[in-house]
């Protein structure tokens, strides 16, 4: 496929993609948000409740060491907005609920629930920074240490209903294999998330971390059952227990738009070697020969392709190309992503995806952003 044909295909796909997303799809939610913001004048009861729940998370405070265990299930209760004031109207364990009416007087409810097994997790990276206070009695600084533990529920569900009908849901399911103190070299974490907002659905399937040597993630964004974007990534490597020594090996990543109308596939054979090659290149950015050699090494580690219109043969090869840049007093070398098409033509990313060539899709995107800003301001 030549560059001209590829550009036409991408123009068509980008416009079709933007045409699938309409700001009016979110009009209902903007009205609900506007009602909630305008009517909620006094949330002092909620603030006091939250502080009480937060205080309940403190397990111990000995020898200036404060140990907290944060549990979603600790934050339960039911609140109703009436006359601009939030009032506590219920207290059922395992559920947090907020009731209010929108501008039309339609009852709306936001509910947070948890279920399933709870797993206690802790890692030193969760802990807060040590604080030092001067003790005038002893003339010395006193160190306060904060340790943060979390109780991770197996299932978390957040729901927005209007007139009893679900309009938005977020469901998070997690599976953790740990003894409590997270060991990044041994433990496994797997999380799946599904969020539904009107006709839109975002699914993150099996975002997984496996025994310090493998990371996986996959996600899709769809509307009315049609997949708008699909993404996946997988990486292999190693990590030590403190996460201060990370090695990256093979990495693959794919992104597809409108069921394969446009797809980018990237494979890196060795992440560490790629990082080293790029570091070396930019440490020699005033030496053309050295810079080119290191970028050539980087390209040998990358296999990146652009596929169009659902075809098995790639439309363009994606690679890094050395480009000379000139400043006021000196010149240096930089690497920019380039596309090489079937007709032999080569374009930098910036030269191919110009505002002029994709002005229709860009205008559609800017209008969408502007409309959403007005809706949710």
Stretches found by the model and what they are:
Residues 4-29, 41, 237-377:
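Hydrophilic extracytoplasmic domains
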């Amino acid at each position: 496929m030549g560059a001209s044909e590829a550009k036409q295909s991408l123009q068509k796909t980008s416009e079709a993609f933007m045409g699938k997303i309409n700001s009016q799809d979110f009009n209902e939610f903007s009205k609900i948000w506007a009602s909630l913001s305008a009517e909620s004048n006094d949330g002092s009861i909620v603030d006091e409740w939250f502080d009480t729940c937060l205080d309940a998370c403190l397990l111990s405070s000995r020898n200036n060491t404060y140990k907290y265990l944060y549990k979603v299930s600790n934050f339960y209760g039911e609140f109703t907005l009436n006359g601009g004031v939030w009032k506590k109207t219920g207290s059922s364990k395992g559920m947090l609920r907020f009731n209010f009416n929108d501008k039309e007087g339609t009852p709306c409810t936001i509910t947070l629930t948890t279920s399933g097994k709870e797993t206690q997790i802790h890692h030193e990276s969760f802990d807060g920074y040590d604080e030092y206070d001067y003790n005038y009695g002893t003339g010395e600084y006193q160190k306060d240490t904060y340790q943060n533990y979390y109780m991770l529920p197996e299932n978390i569900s957040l729901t927005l209903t209007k007139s009893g009908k679900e309009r938005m849901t977020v469901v998070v399911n997690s599976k953790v294999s740990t003894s409590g103190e997270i060991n990044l070299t041994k433990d496994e974490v797997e999380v799946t998330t599904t969020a539904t907002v009107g006709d839109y659905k975002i699914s993150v399937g099996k975002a997984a971390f496996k025994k310090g040597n493998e990371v996986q993630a996959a996600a899709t964004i769809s509307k009315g059952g049609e997949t708008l974007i699909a993404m996946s990534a997988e990486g292999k490597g190693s990590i030590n227990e403190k996460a201060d020594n990370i090695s990256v090996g093979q990495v693959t990543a794919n992104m597809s738009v409108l069921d394969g109308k446009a797809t980018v596939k990237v494979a890196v054979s060795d992440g560490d070697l790629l990082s080293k090659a790029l570091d070396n290149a930019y440490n020699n950015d005033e030496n053309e020969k050295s810079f080119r050699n290191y970028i050539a090494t980087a390209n040998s580690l990358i296999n990146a392709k652009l596929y169009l219109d659902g075809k098995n043969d790639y439309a363009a090869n994606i690679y890094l190309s050395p480009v000379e840049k000139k400043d006021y007093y000196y010149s240096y070398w930089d690497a920019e992503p380039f596309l090489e098409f079937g007709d032999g033509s080569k374009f930098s990313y910036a030269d191919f995806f110009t505002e002029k060539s994709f002005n229709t899709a860009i205008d559609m995107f800017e209008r969408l952003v502007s409309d959403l800003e007005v809706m949710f301001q």
